[in-house]
Amino acid sequence: MVARAMRAWAQDPNIELLGPLDAERIGVFALNIRSGSKKLHYGLVVALLNDLFGIQARGGCSCAGPYGHALLGIGDDDALRHQQEVRGGQSVLRPGWVRLGFNYFFDERTTDYIIEAVRFVAAHGAAFMSLYKVNPQSGVWAMSGAVRPKARPATLLEALAPDAALQQTGE
């Protein structure tokens, strides 16, 4: 599955795989998505993978420090500028990438689903930008006007099977 993802994503000009492409890999990928000459913010990519496909991914720099700077081509001057921006409350400007993984028990269908979801975001992610807002302080992207439930289910039974809970109460 790792080789399949690597082949598919390495051929896509909008997907930038980080790290040496010829090294042996476990099922974890670090990548960025391009839209034209610019990168989509890793936080937006993570939000799109979650909101559109239910895929959990992480965005950021993975506590990689100097290695992360090397992967992203960030020199000392840029690193200092980023540090000052983040300290000034602009966490959204923190450099980083998207990380996602393939578990050993994923079947081919799940593997293909993840591969194609990333390819979809690479092809169409920029079109969704107007539907999202970013909190500059936290760097978190959220769909604007997203509907949130007003109340949580009262019981686990209601959460897992609302119809069964209604039948038990006679409603």
Q: Language-model features: where?
A:
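Glycine- and other small-residue-rich loops at beta-strand/loop junctions that grip anionic moieties
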Residues: 103
